[in-house]
UniProtKB/Swiss-Prot annotation:
Glycosyltransferase recorded as keyword: no
Motif (Histidine box-1): 201-205
Predominant cellular place of this UniProt entry's protein: endoplasmic reticulum
Ranges where the Fatty acid hydroxylase domain occurs: 188-312
Motif (Histidine box-2): 214-218
Bilayer-crossing regions: 94-114, 142-162, 181-201, 249-269
Top enzyme class: oxidoreductase
Gene: ERG3
The protein's name: Delta(7)-sterol 5(6)-desaturase
GO BP terms: cellular response to xenobiotic stimulus; ergosterol biosynthetic process
Stated role: May contribute to the regulation of ergosterol biosynthesis.
Length: 364
């Protein structure tokens, strides 16, 4: 995240913070408080400022250093010191990260889900008896309202990374198995986070936890791509924990981290798009996740079926999900709806918070 933040600080945030909290405000603050809060001090001598910039920009940044003390991608400029809040100030880091993660999260969700809806999504789902009235609007509304809070909860993890508490690194020794190391990291990341999400997901299905946190996401029995992030923000936070824990305990390249975070969001959209293209027994694809939304107690995994098989919660998707003719067959849907209703009764007790497109009594 330091690479992203340094880029945004250089092009945007240095200017923004200079206007919101100019360094001139330091005149009215006691020196002891300035030092305690790590605030910038006014440099009235332009020669001294340029000498400071020259020295600072010549220092080579070590990956473990605290972010903002020395440059890495871009040299420091006069604007770097124009705000009362320096780049490494914890208050500035907090608000900058919250803004970045929120905006990036919203854009990634809306763009990826929209592209999936246009090019991949199976629109026959609109005719499914368990599709809700105004469902897509409700999914987007919940996701857009949840993402800022989810971002807020994850900011402390990114702050730990910025302050040198992670095992993220940048330099790669290509001559000594650097590429192999990178590929192994991708595999271990998927393995570790798949296990972490499985455990978190099973916990979220404990009755009390389910009703408090996870139930909003299971309002969608058949999904559109916009259901991918439509859940309670604390639910989303717990399911993301393994992504943040991994770089705290295992090495991971910084660029790989950004790529994998983008991939995770893409995957979340994909398994909610209703397009059952893969029936791979290893991959926890769209069909497996459709089974989870319909029948609640199966297929908790994110990327693979490994942990569900080990945990006894794997359920093979029905063949009808992969047959375009059978997928929307009336008898198949009626059987599916009856079984889903039984699981709703078992898990939730009633179905009063759902209004279906086909439910004339509720819609009239």
């Amino acid at each position: 995240m330091d690479l992203v933040l340094e880029t945004l600080d250089h092009y945007i945030f240095d200017d923004v913070y200079a206007k919101i909290a100019p360094v001139e405000l330091q005149r009215g603050i006691d020196d002891s408080l300035v030092n305690a809060l790590s605030l910038n001090k006014i440099v009235s001598n332009s020669t001294l400022l340029h000498e400071t910039l020259s020295i600072t920009n010549s220092l080579k940044r070590v990956n473990k250093d605290v972010y903002g003390l020395t440059p890495f991608l871009f040299d420091f400029t006069e604007k770097t010191y124009a705000s009362l809040l320096p780049r490494n100030n914890l208050i500035r880091e907090f608000f900058s990260l919250w803004a970045v993660v929120t905006v990036f999260g919203l854009l990634l969700y809306l763009i990826t889900a929209s592209l999936s809806y246009v090019f991949v999504f199976d629109r026959t789902i609109f005719n499914h008896p368990k599709y809700l009235k105004n469902q897509m609007y409700l999914e987007i509304k919940l996701a857009v309202s949840a993402i800022p809070t989810m971002s807020l909860l994850t900011v402390p993890w990114f702050m730990l990374e910025l302050n040198g508490y992670s095992k993220l690194y940048y330099d790669v020794d290509w001559e000594h198995h650097g590429l192999r190391k990178l590929l192994i990291e991708y595999a271990t990341f998927i393995f570790f986070t798949d296990c972490g999400i499985y455990l978190a997901h099973r916990w979220l299905h404990w009755p009390r936890v389910y009703k408090a946190l996870h139930k909003p996401h299971h309002k969608w029995l058949v999904c559109t791509p916009f259901a991918s992030h439509a859940f309670h923000p604390v639910d989303g936070y717990f399911q993301s924990l393994s992504y943040h824990i991994y770089p705290m305990i295992l090495p991971l390249h910084k660029i790989s981290y950004l790529i994998l975070f983008t991939f995770v969001n893409f995957w979340s959209v994909m398994i909610h798009d209703g397009q059952h293209m893969s029936n791979n027994p290893v991959v926890n694809g769209t069909a497996c996740h459709t089974v989870h939304h319909l029948y609640f107690n199966y297929n908790y995994g994110q990327f693979t079926t490994l942990w569900d098989r080990l945990g006894g919660s794997y359920r093979r998707p029905e063949d009808s999900l992969f047959d375009p003719k059978l997928k929307m067959d009336k008898k198949v849907l009626e059987k599916q709806a009856r079984e889903t209703a039984a699981y709703i009764q078992e898990v939730e007790g009633d179905d009063t918070d759902r209004v279906y497109n086909t439910d004339k009594k509720k819609t009239n």
